[in-house]
């Protein structure tokens, strides 16, 4: 008998394993990662706000990325921690919808924001004399606002379409959060139009920003090759290396999950990759942007007694 989506009051999240010992081990690992993410990103945001030396476009974007990663991780990890140690693996229909909406909105926003950072790096390296004028605080704020608006507008579209399906099968989600592909597996009805829309949103929100990032780095490489001194060359490379590492890890994870042909898709492998970009990546992003950064280290020394 079919059940329409309004009769589904909750979903069951299978998570990673049913073994109690392994669940406890995962709880400890995820708690440690989440604690580092919260403390580290919060500290970085405070440093950027308090230290005038960090009041530059580059650190403005870094601070916003830290805020986004902090928010992004908080959408998933608290529920994952509860699921690991609780007998109750359920999530309400409204809770699943909210988790889906915010996760999609923040994921899309990060794609746009990473593209904005790439543009900032391009201007800093290719047009250093015009950098302060070109990357004004108004433009930086506008780029961040557009990133969030674009992300959440598109998230509203895909959330509405996804949760308008009739969930006529079991309400068991083979994942640790309310992700797109496991939810679509539970839905019944014609999905052809939905899949077209899904891949259109993937192209417009993920592929297009990736193309902009690639174009920015092609221009950056062209500019770097014109630098005669090895010191200037290394400085330009170090300016971009952290961002390029972050982009590669983030886009690689997303494209692996959502862009692979359906026949090669594995829910078990998806769980591992999803864990990386939802839980681990926000912590890695913090390390990538701050641990090797001399300005951040100096600001931290000033803050600590």
Curated annotation (Swiss-Prot):
Major location category of this protein: membrane
Claim: Membrane is one of the keywords in the record: yes
Extracellular side: 1-24, 75-98, 160-196, 258-270
GO cellular component: a single term: plasma membrane
Record key words, sorted: Cell membrane, Disulfide bond, G-protein coupled receptor, Glycoprotein, Membrane, Olfaction, Receptor, Sensory transduction, Transducer, Transmembrane, Transmembrane helix
Membership in a protein family: Belongs to the G-protein coupled receptor 1 family.
Name of the featured protein: Olfactory receptor 9G1
Species of the source: Homo sapiens
